[in-house]
Amino acid sequence: MNPYVLTILLSSLGLGTILTFASSHWLLAWMGLEINTLAIIPIMAQQSHPRAIEATTKYFLTQATAAAMILFASTTNAWLVGEWEIHQLSHPLATTTVMLALALKLGLAPVHFWLPEVLQGLELTTGLILSTWQKLAPFALMIQVAPTINSSLLIAMGLLSTLVGGWGGLNQTQLRKILAYSSIAHLGWMVLILQYAPSLTLLSLFLYIIMTSSAFLTLKTNNSLTINTLATSWTKSPTLAALTALVLLSLGGLPPLSGFMPKWLILQELTKQGLPLSATLAAMTALLSLYFYLRLCYAMTLTIYPNTLTATAPWRLNFTLITLPLSIITILALGLLPLTPAVTTLLTL
């Protein structure tokens, strides 16, 4: 793609997200979401491949449906209540419709079916943008409307997302689909605690973005798209293979890695709020996700394929452009757990 065109599209992505962040009126927020969608579609379709075009079409249809639902809900609220402000969303029909629309934009269960299929048809870098940056604007709106939404609906969607995210990834061999189901599971954890501790939701979103970015970048550097290619990565770059395994375990939430922190704090907060059953179910579904991460690590580190290479394994990474950001983001994805006491102190301020 032409660098000037790419710069304009990426600037439009940033503009759309910032516009949604800064808006208090539903029409402005809707406009920001639409700018976001229209900016990423050419980036998704830059590969002239039928799979990429199919993924782009599916993404466009789902996002257009969600945008229409948001417009319908805000208009309904303005008609019945007389308010266009995001914080003044009060009618039950409008709040439920907006929640479903934002869930469709994010890929929350039970409206998650588009996300694995779309992510499977994209390059890893475009999939990274879709899995991280494109979640910010809908989440900003969801945090603002969360106090008016029925808490039972949020808990049900959160638990269903963690279950679907864990269950759906079990039988996958494509890494992009596994990361898509991982995204669904993490979003479920965020929605689960959204009404009780929004600061924990933001912390989880921040750590999710760091860990997912690290996972996508390591897979991009490894040039791995399936479990089979991931299993041969040890012979190509042992250091990167070890880092990839640690990042995947961090995504699974194993201590002492960074991914354990948000799960630990969310389970603690749910128990404090008198929801031990929800906390237990969430912890049980986390085991499903952990299983397929362990499966990937087993394929990478414990089953080294026979090879005929006589050359010494290259311990140094070849891609100098990606090495520095990859190093920084991987360190953050692995080593933030010791900061948990400081984080809990900040959350109570």
UniProtKB/Swiss-Prot annotation:
Protein family according to the UniProt entry: Belongs to the complex I subunit 2 family.
Membrane topology value: Multi-pass membrane protein
Catalytic activity: a ubiquinone + NADH + 5 H(+)(in) = a ubiquinol + NAD(+) + 4 H(+)(out)
GO cellular component: mitochondrial inner membrane
Superkingdom classification of source: Eukaryota
GO annotation terms (biological process): mitochondrial electron transport, NADH to ubiquinone
Record-given protein name: NADH-ubiquinone oxidoreductase chain 2
Organism, scientific name: Salmo salar
Entry-linked InterPro entries: Complex_I_Subunit_2, NADH_DH_su2_C, NADH_UbQ_OxRdtase_chain2, ND/Mrp_TM
